[in-house]
């Protein structure tokens, strides 16, 4: 199992930014997140002086687009099921279960983060479903998917995960998710920060990427230079269709895009 304990570092930062921007519950805003947001604020200030999206705006845009895509899927499939992997301190599970009481929405993360998330959910939700703790790269995922009804569509969400993975690990993850969920009609929602080859503030973004990598002792990187590379990777791992959703088009954002949102789809192989 690859070691991704460092991911919880940025989970605190992201959760605090979401709280600041009014789209999260205060309970997910930690002291650690406050200090991280303060540390990265100067970089965001520089980005906000240009026509390009800042880190904060990127976090907001990706969350909004994933939420809107999920709303569309729920409207299309009333018995839709949701599995959010690497859920971190995202408020999405809590918010959607509150809005849709009958929605089957499960969350999954590494052991330490899963325990923290469970503790926080227990304070704001009545009998929240258990936060799962499973190696997403292993055959153990079969036991996770066994908890869902394969006769109904399933959407897997991973927000803030892919930039911690090399293209090889991303391929392994997508192959495993497709293999273990082969009997489901599958949708997959995720985000990805591409390499800023044409970004006016490229040096600032690369500096921010380096800082996150050093502070979290992780492999965080801005990856995938073009859409064709991503389309090929998705096709090679079992997805039949991949849509790339851009904030400038989807949300009519006046800023040039910093983040992509992915919506991949696949029909079941058998029932």
Where are the language model's segments positioned?
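A short beta-strand submotif of the Rossmann-like class I SAM-dependent methyltransferase core
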Residues: 155-158, 170
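Core SAM-dependent methyltransferase catalytic element
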Residues: 248-271
């Amino acid at each position: 199992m690859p070691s991704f304990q460092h991911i919880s570092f940025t989970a605190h930062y992201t959760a605090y930014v979401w709280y600041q921007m009014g789209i999260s519950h205060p309970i997910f805003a930690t002291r650690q997140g406050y200090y991280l947001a303060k540390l990265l604020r100067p970089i965001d200030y520089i980005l906000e002086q240009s026509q390009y999206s800042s880190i904060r705006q990127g976090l907001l845009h990706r969350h909004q687009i994933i939420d809107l895509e999920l709303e569309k899927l729920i409207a299309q499939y009333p018995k839709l099921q949701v599995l959010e992997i690497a859920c971190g301190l995202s408020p999405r599970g809590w918010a959607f279960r509150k809005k849709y009481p009958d929605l089957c929405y499960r969350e999954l993360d590494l052991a330490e983060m899963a325990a923290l998330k469970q503790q926080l959910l227990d304070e704001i939700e009545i009998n929240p479903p258990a936060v799962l703790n499973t190696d997403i790269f292993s055959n153990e995922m079969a036991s996770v998917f066994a908890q869902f009804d394969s006769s109904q569509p399933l959407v897997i969400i991973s927000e803030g995960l892919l930039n911690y993975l090399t293209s090889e690990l991303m391929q392994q993850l997508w192959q495993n998710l497709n293999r273990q969920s082969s009997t489901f009609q599958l949708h997959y929602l995720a985000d990805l920060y591409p390499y800023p080859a044409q970004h006016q503030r490229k040096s600032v973004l690369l500096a921010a990427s380096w800082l996150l990598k050093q502070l979290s002792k992780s492999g965080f990187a801005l990856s995938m230079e073009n859409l064709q590379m991503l389309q090929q990777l998705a096709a090679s791992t079992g997805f039949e269709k991949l849509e790339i959703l851009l904030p400038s088009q989807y949300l009519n954002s006046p800023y040039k895009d910093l983040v992509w949102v992915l919506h991949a789809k696949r029909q079941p192989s058998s029932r």
